[in-house]
Amino acid sequence: MMNRLLVFLMLGAAFMLVVSAIDQDANEDINKRGIPCLCDSDGPSVRGNTLSGIIWLAGCPSGWHNCKKHGPTIGWCCKQ
């Protein structure tokens, strides 16, 4: 009985370690890149065009500029 409990705890710990590592990597990617948006210079449509802007909720930070005349409903579409 004790061996089964120990095996169960070890498998649970290994699972939690893997899940926490995957989640941490996903958060780092979002922090680095943000949510992409379509700048006016990208073209009229999302299809086939790269999304070169990033949505910022509290305005564009220093070194960035608003790249869309009519921005997204929430936040600003900014480009470096």
UniProtKB/Swiss-Prot annotation:
Keywords for the protein's UniProt record, in alphabetical order: Cleavage on pair of basic residues, Disulfide bond, Ion channel impairing toxin, Nematocyst, Neurotoxin, Secreted, Signal, Toxin, Voltage-gated sodium channel impairing toxin
Disulfide bridge positions per record: 37-77, 39-67, 60-78
Function according to Swiss-Prot or TrEMBL: Binds specifically to voltage-gated sodium channels (Nav) (site 3), thereby delaying their inactivation during signal transduction. Has a strong effect on crustaceans and insects and a weaker effect on mammals. It strongly inhibits D.melanogaster sodium channel (DmNav1). It strongly affects the heart sodium channels (Nav1.5/SCN5A) and weakly inhibits the brain sodium channel Nav1.2/SCN2A. In vivo, when released into the medium, this recombinant toxin induces impaired swimming, paralysis and death of the crustacean A.nauplii within several hours.
Presence of keyword Cell membrane: no
SUPFAM superfamilies linked: Defensin-like (SSF57392)
GO molecular function: sodium channel regulator activity; toxin activity
Signal peptide: 1-21
Organism: Anemonia viridis
Name used for this protein in its record: Delta-actitoxin-Avd1e 1
A GO CC term attached to the entry: nematocyst
Family per similarity comment: Belongs to the sea anemone sodium channel inhibitory toxin family. Type I subfamily.
